[in-house]
């Protein structure tokens, strides 16, 4: 078995720095309180929307957790919506976000657009029951925690790492089982290799509850 740093992700590689993106546009808003400069992420936050659009690592996990806690403090009885388009990432960062989602009083709705792979798929499933969704062409990928590479050390060190990998795998399986209604043994079998699901497949599997229609089409009906 090939082993590496346990901070590596469910995707099987240690998370790297997020890729550079285009410059985030800013805009001016006028209100009775005056004029302020804003950007899309600030505007989403004002609407109680959190956007996970990068891999799951310590930095993104801290950002997500901070937003969840602030939104709960502002109004613990109003829903929070988390939009997800992520390739996954660190297992420990995943569980930090997961625990915070379960900890806050507010319901956390989850919506996948693009993809929710690996760790991100668990976060998608962890939304409040009845409030988990995908857009029509989103995809979901689930698989076991898989650590690649190599480490130097004694046999006892390798045994410790192997035991930790098995613990992580069982935790992921029981977590997915809890939120999908599947048996943990079924989850283990299905995640032994990459399992790729369409939006409808994810609904049937129990990861989400709804496949959203396009708003334009809904308005025309």
From Swiss-Prot:
GO cellular component terms listed in the entry, alphabetical order: cytoplasm; endopeptidase Clp complex
Enzyme Commission numbers on file: 3.4.21.92
Active site residues of this protein: 118, 143
UniProt keyword Cell membrane, yes or no: no
Residue stretches in coiled coil: none
Molecular functions per Gene Ontology: ATP-dependent peptidase activity; ATPase binding; serine-type endopeptidase activity
Membrane-crossing residue ranges in chain numbering: none
Localization of this protein: Cytoplasm
Catalysed reactions listed for this entry: Hydrolysis of proteins to small peptides in the presence of ATP and magnesium. alpha-casein is the usual test substrate. In the absence of ATP, only oligopeptides shorter than five residues are hydrolyzed (such as succinyl-Leu-Tyr-|-NHMec, and Leu-Tyr-Leu-|-Tyr-Trp, in which cleavage of the -Tyr-|-Leu- and -Tyr-|-Trp bonds also occurs)
Pfam family, one: CLP_protease
GO biological process entries: protein quality control for misfolded or incompletely synthesized proteins
Principal subcellular localisation of the protein: cytoplasm
Keywords, in A-Z order: Cytoplasm, Hydrolase, Protease, Serine protease
Subunit structure: Fourteen ClpP subunits assemble into 2 heptameric rings which stack back to back to give a disk-like structure with a central cavity, resembling the structure of eukaryotic proteasomes.
Similarity field: Belongs to the peptidase S14 family.
Function: Cleaves peptides in various proteins in a process that requires ATP hydrolysis. Has a chymotrypsin-like activity. Plays a major role in the degradation of misfolded proteins.
NCBIfam families registered for this protein in UniProt: PRK00277.1, PRK12553.1
Protein name per its UniProtKB record: ATP-dependent Clp protease proteolytic subunit 3
Organism, scientific name: Nocardia farcinica (strain IFM 10152)
Lineage of origin: Bacteria, Bacillati, Actinomycetota, Actinomycetes, Mycobacteriales
């Amino acid at each position: 078995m090939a082993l590496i740093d346990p901070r590596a992700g469910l995707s099987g590689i240690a998370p790297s720095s997020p890729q550079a993106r285009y410059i985030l546009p800013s805009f001016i808003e006028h209100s009775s309180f005056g004029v302020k400069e804003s950007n899309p992420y600030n505007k989403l936050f004002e609407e109680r929307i959190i956007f996970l659009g990068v891999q799951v690592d310590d930095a993104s996990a801290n950002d997500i957790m901070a937003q969840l806690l602030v939104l709960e403090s502002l109004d613990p009885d109003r829903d929070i919506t988390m939009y997800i388009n992520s390739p996954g990432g660190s297992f420990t960062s995943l569980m930090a976000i997961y625990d915070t989602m379960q900890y806050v009083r507010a319901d956390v709705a989850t919506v996948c657009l693009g993809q929710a792979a690996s760790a991100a798929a668990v976060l998608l499933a962890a939304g409040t029951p009845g409030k988990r969704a995908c857009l029509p062409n989103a995809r979901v990928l689930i698989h076991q925690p898989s650590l690649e590479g190599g480490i130097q050390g004694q046999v006892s060190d390798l045994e410790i790492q192997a035991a930790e990998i098995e613990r992580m795998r069982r935790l992921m399986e029981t977590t997915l089982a809890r939120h999908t209604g599947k048996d943990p043994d079924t989850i283990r079998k299905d995640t032994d290799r990459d399992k790729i699901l369409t939006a409808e497949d994810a609904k049937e599997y129990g990861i989400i509850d709804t496949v959203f229609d396009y708003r334009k089409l809904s308005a025309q009906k």
